[in-house]
């Protein structure tokens, strides 16, 4: 399954706010479609599926990519759900988004893919790159790159910088100080239900 490229507000109305996908909020509180307001009681499977979809769409992943992350999380000591969120949050595209360099994760991915971002002084154009504590994330020292990010900083996707990051707006340089803590994950999701969803596949 490929990444979702359809109407974003339609997804937000169905799943709730997805801060990584879009800054817009749904004006209608019920799901889209003719029968959106007449929702039947959902099965446990449907609830787990919805949480999985939230995670996949917010971080802009394909089904295969998310499954790989679940498998990686299972191999790490600790809560699989929490490790899964940390792996997703520490991706380079998400880190660029959380630093305020881009208004959404898709926009951050584009910055990375087009070579506008450096890690420890070297251009990294792989959005899935895992950022580590101590690494410096910066805007490439080129006029087009700086202009893009300076424009984005005027309209950040999220207001608060998470505690594991720091950012110098004048130099356009950020630093990863630690791995993100659960309370700073912006997406409202039950990660345990996501792990349960994949329990037979991972």
From Swiss-Prot:
Residues 22-43 are annotated as: Disordered. InterPro entries: Ribosomal_uS4, Ribosomal_uS4_bac-type, Ribosomal_uS4_CS, Ribosomal_uS4_N, S4_RNA-bd, S4_RNA-bd_sf. The keyword Protein transport does not apply. One of its GO terms (cellular component) is small ribosomal subunit. It holds the Pfam family Ribosomal_S4. HAMAP family: Ribosomal_uS4_B (MF_01306_B). This is Small ribosomal subunit protein uS4.
């Amino acid at each position: 399954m490929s990444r979702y490229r359809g109407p974003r507000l339609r997804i937000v109305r169905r799943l709730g706010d997805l801060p990584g996908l879009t800054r817009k909020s749904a004006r209608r509180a019920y799901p889209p479609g003719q029968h959106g307001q007449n929702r039947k009681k959902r099965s446990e499977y449907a609830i787990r599926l919805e949480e999985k979809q939230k995670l996949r769409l917010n971080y802009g992943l394909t089904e295969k990519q998310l499954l790989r992350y679940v498998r990686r999380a299972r191999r790490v000591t600790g809560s699989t759900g929490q490790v899964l969120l940390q792996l997703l949050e520490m991706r380079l595209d998400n880190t660029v988004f959380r630093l305020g360099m881009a208004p959404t994760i898709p926009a951050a991915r584009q910055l990375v893919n087009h070579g506008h971002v450096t890690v420890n002084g070297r251009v990294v154009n792989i959005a899935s790159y895992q950022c580590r504590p101590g690494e410096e994330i910066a805007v490439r020292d080129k006029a087009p790159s700086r202009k893009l990010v300076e424009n984005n900083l005027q309209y950040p996707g999220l207001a608060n910088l998470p505690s594991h990051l720091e950012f110098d707006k004048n130099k356009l340089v950020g630093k990863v100080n630690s791995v993100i803590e659960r309370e700073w994950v912006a997406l409202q999701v039950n990660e345990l239900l996501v792990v349960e969803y994949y329990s037979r596949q991972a």
